Swiss-Prot record:
Species of the source: Shewanella sp. (strain MR-7)
Binding-site list for NAD(+): 52-53, 130, 176-178, 196, 201, 242-243, 263-267, 273-274, 322, 492
Gene that this sequence comes from: hutU
Protein name: Urocanate hydratase
Cofactor annotation remark: Binds 1 NAD(+) per subunit.
Cofactors, names only: NAD(+)
GO molecular function, one term: urocanate hydratase activity
Protein location: Cytoplasm
Family: Belongs to the urocanase family.
Record InterPro entries: Urocanase, Urocanase-like, Urocanase_C, Urocanase_central_sf, Urocanase_CS, Urocanase_N, Urocanase_Rossmann-like, Urocanase_sf
Amino acid sequence: MDKRHDPSRRIIAPHGSQLSCKSWLTEAPMRMLMNNLHPDVAERPEDLVVYGGIGRAARDWDCYDKIIEVLKRLEDDETLMVQSGKPVGVFRTHADAPRVLIANSNLVPHWANWEHFNELDKQGLAMYGQMTAGSWIYIGTQGIVQGTYETFVAVAKQHFGGVAAGKWILTGGLGGMGGAQTLAGTMAGFSVLACEVDETRIDFRLRTRYVDKKATSLDEALAMINDANASGKPVSVGLLANAADVFAELVKRGITPDVVTDQTSAHDPLNGYLPQGWTMAQAADMRKTDEAAVVKAAKASMAVQVQAMLDLQAAGAATLDYGNNIRQMAFETGVKNAFDFPGFVPAYIRPLFCEGIGPFRWVALSGDPEDIYKTDAKVKELIPDNPHLHNWLDMARERIAFQGLPARICWVGLKDRARLAQAFNEMVKNGELSAPIVIGRDHLDSGSVASPNRETESMMDGSDAVSDWPLLNALLNTASGATWVSLHHGGGVGMGFSQHSGVVIVCDGTEAAAKRVGRVLWNDPATGVMRHADAGYEIAKNCAKEQGLDLPMLKD
């Protein structure tokens, strides 16, 4: 019997202002853990899988139940320790210490590979936390939408003079992360053709308004794209097909998309990528009997897909890796020039990271969408001179369906995060919001990740693989008084390829919270500016000087 599987479970976080725990500092992590497993949020909630292949919220259902039990009794001077999804200890700390400290899927580097991890996983000794799955701040696909939108806007600026109309994106994957591509693409003005082997995922994206149409053949999908481009109104199409098959077929037909990328779960060849010619049932059976054969077949198909991406790049498509490590998998399978197309961070996002700009997100613990709409208005009020941000907030309200507890994401940086958080805390204090807000972020941020094939690819000083930075980030956020802090390994790109940290803090309207958010939400993005200034980026150095950061080795 698999202790991680229970189809009878249906988890819905409490709404409103009534507490189940002893304070909002423990109610918040409880609600956010539960929200990660909401049926409209998680990919496979019955298996505790939130997104990203096997990214889980808790190690098994016994651990989940015990975490909830402990949070309900936890005092405001105690800290719960969670080791790979398992609650292992409660310790007396102090009121400004985190209420929860989390470490997920961390392995000593020599053993940091999927083979060793999968053995531990089967024995119930580890859990893959992805990034926000095991750190309890996943907000559904919205969590990656703006970052994807910003990337596609940058693609349009670099390659098409800022005009995306009449252009289309080819991609793969409509899971928790990949599902953002279709909506983000159309918001940026592109049509999008996304390949997905799991029809339930396409239907889920249709239901939550992330995909406009479904197609069951390539010809049908291309006709939809062509019609949209002719009309000038972008459309997103979920095509029920294997991405490797479709990408290679387009090369064969001589059809070149304007943009090519991919967000299949290629980071996990055993659980995340369906080999060409295989059914999902066949793959599920083979995972139980011959894991090595599954991995070999999946990586062979990834090699086919990456080769097609290279061919489409040669034919004129703007081609980019979107951080799922598919280039690495193809390289290991013989595609020696797999890294000839760039990752999205060095190509489009790094200048934002240099100013500490990244995926700032917040969630209304009340469950009331009006609380989010009021905070949207507050963001516009406090950042009046950023029409791009205002446009994003307007589009998000109009086009993004909330999943689980209402939430919002917007990319802001060092200059704005702390003051926005303090304003939100004041709104809770004054009764403008019906319950406290939690503020967090993706681990994909400027100072919180070391990932040489994604966020820290091609650092100008060669420090791509130095992982001191996310460790320092986690330590500083803990010292600064975050409500919960997490330190993970393997998110996004898989075992052995990344280390990263997460942070969440509660705005409960108290003066103590105002002080904590002021520290945490200044220091957290400041570590990103520090990291990039240390690597030699002039934008980061200038930002550090402008904001008065004390960086001892930064020369005037």
